[in-house]
UniProtKB/Swiss-Prot annotation:
This is Fibrinogen alpha-2 chain. It comes from Petromyzon marinus (Sea lamprey). Residues 228-327 are annotated as: Disordered. The record marks R31, G32 as: Cleavage. The keyword Transport does not apply. Glycans are attached at N271, N397, N458. Fibrinogen has a double function: yielding monomers that polymerize into fibrin and acting as a cofactor in platelet aggregation.
Length: 641
């Protein structure tokens, strides 16, 4: 190459280097000119072309131009917006799904709550049926034991008579044989050996029949099973000291009807029990069976007194024997005293009264024998009454027992008279009542009592519906339990026992089978089947006018709610107390309390009528009684003979 050629090359490189460093628009771009399609609008990017969008040190020589950068930003923005829209739609779907799930959860929760409620109701019905079944089983066992005792006595009697017949035949044959040749008249006697053989076979067959008594399933054993099942149905209440009756406690706890609070009161039992005199205390089972067993199953009976011996002794005064039930076996008890329903109002004596058939031992773990009916007074320990606080249940505020009969048959220690908390079927709240467990088999719920006139019984219908008055643990006080509570206790067939006492100390009683209707039916009293010594005042009424004085089927009437049959006025207003009144009355135990007994109606303004505490068939309408008591007890399951 010549010198001239080298010079031209150097000049060209110098120019190119200068153009590169100047950055002028007129200089040549290293990337060269861009191709522009005919459809593109170049003017829209003209401003960006003059703008330095990047630095050489950062991007290098391939830095994109303004139009390309704008396109990339636009594409990125669209992609971001698309993602935002997609996320927004997903969020909306999630919100909708959450709403649906919440609604489904609410519906499932409602169904679950309903299932739990239905299960609680089913549990309540189940345990009520279980309780009824338990009582029926115990009752059937006692009746069966009574019948087995009868059969055993009949078998023994047949065996004894068979032996006597055989002995008489032998004696007769011997006597006739020894008379031959010495008697004025010859008698031929032939012993029927074939018949005797048949009698012996029949007697042997009867002796082979097993007539052993059933071991009675007492309620304590059932209570243990219920304790194990408390995870489904525990009884309500707190500690045993607050929720269960305490035997022998002398506190002034009182029965006032329905309780408004949720706490369970301490329950007291007095040391003495009110008695309406020498009442026949035999239970219905004892009166029906009316026999005594020939042997005792329990080992304790073998060492008992002559009243519980294995030999059967018929009382000369009563000509019958009573069946006395103990925990396991049936033992003999002979009545040695006067059996009468005309009784005196006396306190329970601690001394032995064998002439009246009443014996009481005052020991700590004694056995009461009243009219030769033995009751075990072992009330258990405080731990027996402890509830299972770890049990699972939604029903923590319900009482375990429905009435006094339920307390007697199921509650350990429930054989003592006193205050107990019960909850009849259908009741919304617990009810504190006085239970009489010593009269005619026990299980009686006190609903009315007059004894000193300290309480005014001329009250409004609402007061009679809710109840008023109190009694203590010993059963002293004046009380009207309340029509609503009485309806819950006697809306099914029940026995109503009316106990009366005059000012001379003599007493009488009347028992009826009753059913009480609800408020919509005016608490009408359906009454039938009278038995007792006080006279049938409720059904028969006054002899001169039975149709207008009978109380059967009558609604409850007060001075402010006149539902009686008298068209000329209000019987309740005239006679001074609410009652089941016709037009007007043969009995009213809620009348005006007059001291002394007999009274002159003409001296009792303003109406001058027989408005005392009366039972016309007992002492007449002009005699105001000193003490009265009305008690209810459910009718137990009848046994078809």
């Amino acid at each position: 190459m010549t010198l001239r050629g080298v010079s031209m090359v150097l000049t060209w490189c110098l120019l190119v280097s200068k153009a590169w460093s100047s950055g002028d628009d007129s200089s040549i771009d290293i990337r060269g000119p861009r191709l522009v399609m005919p459809s593109q609008a170049r003017d829209s990017c003209s401003t960006q072309q003059t703008t330095e969008l990047c630095v050489e040190g950062n991007w290098g020589r391939k830095c994109p131009g303004g139009c390309r950068m704008l396109s990339m930003l636009s594409r990125t923005e669209k992609d971001s917006m698309r993602r935002v829209d997609e996320l927004t739609k997903r969020l909306a779907r999630m919100i909708q799904l959450h709403t649906e799930i919440h609604s489904y959860y609410r519906s499932v929760s409602d169904v679950s709550n309903q299932v739990v409620t239905d299960r609680e109701d089913t549990e309540a019905r189940f345990y009520a049926l279980l309780s009824d079944l338990e009582r029926k089983i115990i009752y059937l066992q006692r009746r069966i034991n009574g019948q087995l005792t009868l059969l055993s006595q009949l078998r023994n009697g047949i065996a004894q008579q068979t032996s006597t017949i055989l002995q008489l035949e032998v004696d007769t044959d011997v006597a006739l044989r020894t008379c031959k040749g010495a008697c004025a008249r010859q008698v031929r006697y032939r012993v029927d050996k074939e018949m005797n053989l048949q009698l012996e076979k029949a007697n042997a067959y009867l002796s082979g029949i097993n007539l052993a008594l059933f071991e009675e399933i007492v309620h304590e054993s059932f209570s243990v099973e219920r304790d194990d099942a408390r995870s489904l149905h525990p009884y309500s209440g707190g500690p045993a000291s607050d929720s269960e009756p305490r035997d022998g406690d002398g506190t002034a706890s009182q029965a006032t009807g329905f309780r408004s609070d949720a706490t369970d009161p301490g329950v007291s039992h007095g040391n003495s029990s009110k008695s309406f005199g020498n009442v026949d205390e035999r239970s219905k089972v004892e009166k029906d069976v009316n026999v005594a067993s020939t042997s005792s199953v329990s080992s304790s009976s073998s060492s008992s007194s002559s009243s519980s011996s294995t030999s059967s002794t018929i009382s000369s005064t009563q000509k019958t024997e009573e069946l006395s039930f103990k925990k396991v076996s049936v033992s003999t008890a002979a009545v040695a005293g006067k059996d009468t329903d005309d009784f005196q109002w006396d306190s329970v004596q601690t001394a032995s009264q064998t002439e009246e058939g009443f014996v009481r031992d005052t020991g700590a773990d004694s056995t009461w024998n009243q009219h030769n009916v033995q009751w075990n007074s072992d009330f258990g320990t405080a731990s027996d009454d402890e509830p299972d606080f770890q049990a699972r249940s939604h029903r923590t505020n319900l009482s375990e027992y429905i009435d006094c009969l339920d307390v007697l048959q199921r509650r350990p220690g429930g054989k003592a008279s006193g205050l107990y908390e019960v909850r009849p079927r259908g009741a919304k709240r617990a009810l504190t009542v006085h239970c009489e467990q010593d009269t005619d088999g026990g299980g009686w719920t006190l609903v009315q009592q007059r004894e000193d006139g300290s309480l005014n019984f001329n009250r409004s219908f609402s007061a009679y519906r809710e109840g008023f008055g109190t009694v203590d643990g010993s059963g002293h006080g004046e009380l009207w339990l309340g029509l609503e509570a009485m309806y819950l206790l006697a809306h099914e067939d029940s026995t109503m026992r009316v106990e009366l006492q005059g000012w001379d100390g003599a007493g009488a009683h009347a028992e009826y089978t009753v059913t009480l209707r609800d408020d919509s039916k005016g608490y009408a009293l359906q009454v039938s089947d009278y038995r007792g010594t006080a006279g049938n005042a409720l059904v028969s009424g006054v002899a001169d006018d039975p149709e207008l004085t009978s109380h059967g089927g009558m609604t409850f009437s007060t001075y402010d709610r006149d539902t009686d049959k008298w068209s000329d006025g209000s019987c309740a207003e005239w006679y001074g107390g609410g009652w089941w009144i016709n037009a007007c009355q043969a009995a009213n135990l809620n009348g005006v309390y007059y001291q002394g007994g007999p009274y002159d109606p003409r001296e009792k303004p303003p109406y001058e009528v027989e408005n005392g505490v009366v039972w016309a068939t007992y002492r007449g309408s002009d005699y105001s009684l000193k003490r009265t008591a009305v008690r209810f007890r459910r009718v137990q399951i009848p046994i078809v003979e």
